[in-house]
Amino acid sequence: MGDVTAPGQQPEPIHDVLIIGGGINGCGIAMDAAGRGLTVLLCEQDDLACATSSRSSKLIHGGLRYLEFFQFRLVGKALAEREILLRNAPHIIRPLRFRLPHQPHLRPAWMIRSGLFLYDHLARRKALPGSRSLRLGPDSPLKPHIVRGFEYSDAWVDDARLVVLTARAAASHGARILTRTACIGAERRGDLWQATLEDRRTGRRSTHLSRALVNAAGPWVAELQQSTIHCQVHHPLRLVKGSHVVVPRLYPGEHAYILQNEDDRIVFVIPFENDFSLIGTTDVDYQGDPAAAAISPQETRYLLRVVNAHFRQQLQETDVLWSYAGVRALADDAHGKAQAASRDYTLDLDQPPGLAPMISVLGGKITTYRRLAEEATDQLCGLLQRPSRPWTAGAALPGGDFADPATLAADLHKLYPWLPDTLLRRFCHSYGTLTHELLEGCRSLDDLGRHFGADLYAREVLYLIQREWVLEPEDLLWRRTKLGLRLRPAEVSVLRDYMDIRTRWHAADHN
C-alpha cells in the first residue's frame, strides 16, 4: 500500500475525515483539513493525479474564453487564485504570456480589447503584466496574412506535481495518504462512517471509521456514490473529455498561443518540456469508464487542423509524439455545447438527520482548487464543530519557500557546480528548495548512482519512492516527471526491473 506519513505519526482509530480521491481537489482538502488540526485519511485507487488532474492544459488561468459565456464570477475567482498560487508555488508555476492572433471575421478587435480589459481588471493583479496589442512581423511563425494580435498574461503549472506537493503538505500536517487503495464499501453507522478499503496490489482489506466523508473521486464521483456508498447524487452530472497532443516544438520563444477557430472554440499551443509543444484542448461529451479515456482520431485531426490554419509549419498525424485525454465531471447546467458547460465547482452536502455527513465535489478547475478546498474544509469544521481559521492562502507548497526562481537556480549552481545545467534546471522547476533534500550528501555526479537514460539517476528514483508515493515507472515517467518523452523502451524496461526490487524493499521497511 503506498503510504507515506509524517515521521512518528500513529494511525488514528477514528479519523475526522476520510477523503476518497487523490486528485487535486482531494489532496487540496486533505492539506487544508490536516493543517487545521483534523485527522485525515485519504485513499486513491491508483496513483496520485492519475486521471483528470494530470491531463489538463497545465494552466493556472482565469479562463479568458469563459467571459463569452458571462461567467464573470468564475473568472474573477480564478484570477485571484492565480496570484496566490504564483506566490505559493514558484517552482512549479510560472508566468506565461499568450499571443492571440487576430482573425477579424471571427471576433472584431473591439470585442477582444474589451474582453482583455475585463481580464486585466476582474481581480487585483500584482505579479503579471497586463495585455497589449501586437504587430506580427516577418519573423512570426504564423502565416503571412496574420499581421495583428494581442498579448496577455496567465501562468503555466506542472499539474501532476501540484497534486503531489499538495499531498506532501497534507502528510507533513499528519494526513495519512494511501495510494493504490480503493474504497470498496462505505456505510453510515450513526454519526460515523465505516469504510472498507482494499490495497489493489496485495488484495488486503481494512476497515476505517471517520466522522465525515468526502467524495472527491472526480469523474467517478457519481459511480462511487451510487454503487459503493449507495447514495444519490443531488445534481445532474455531465462528463466532458478534453484531449491534447504533444509535437516537436513549433516555434522558438517562451510564449504560448491561443488560437480562435471557426466553431467559436479556442485551442492553446504551449511550450512544453523545452523541446515540445502542447496543443489542446477539445471538449467532447463522454460516456464510459474515465480510465479508458483516450484521444480519438477525429480529435487529433481537429487540433492539427486548427494549428495548421495559423502556423507556417504544417503538422501531420505522424508528428504527434504523445497524447492524453482527461474527463471532468461537471454539474450539468443544461448548456447544449460541452464547451459552454460551467467549470465552476459545487460542494454537495448529504447529511440525513442524526447521521454522519458526506460532501461530494463536483466540477472545478485546477486553478481554483485551493479555494474549493478552503470552502470544503470550512464546511467540515462547521459540521464537526471544530473552531478553525483558513490558512492556505499564505502557505508555500513544499519546495516553494523562495521568492525568485533565478536566484534559486544560481544558489543551486553554487552548491552543486557538478550538476549538468539541464538537470539543475529540471530539479529547480520540479523540486525547488527540496532539491537540497534530494541531493543531501552528494558531492559529484557519481553520487547520483545508476544512470537510466536522459537525466534520470537512481538517487531521484529512490527519493520519489521514499517521499512521493511512486510505485510504478509510469508514476515517475509521466506524473512526477515527463521523462517518458525521452527514455527509450529498453531504458524503461531496465528502470522497471530496478523499481520492482526497490519498491518491494521500501514496502517491507514500512510493514
Spans of model-derived segments:
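Glycine-rich FAD pyrophosphate-binding loop
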Residues: 34-54
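Helical element adjacent to the flavin cofactor pocket in flavoenzyme catalytic cores
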Residues: 150-207, 211
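C-terminal catalytic lobe of FAD-dependent flavoproteins
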Residues: 153, 159-161, 169, 229, ...
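Flavin (primarily FAD) binding-site architecture
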Residues: 215-230
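Glycine-rich Rossmann-fold phosphate-binding loop(s) that bind the pyrophosphate
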Residues: 22-23, 45
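Short hydrophobic core segments
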Residues: 20, 208-218
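Dinucleotide-binding Rossmann-like beta1-alpha1 core, especially the glycine-rich loop
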Residues: 58-139
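Extreme N-terminal leader/targeting segments of oxidoreductases
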Residues: 1-17, 32-36
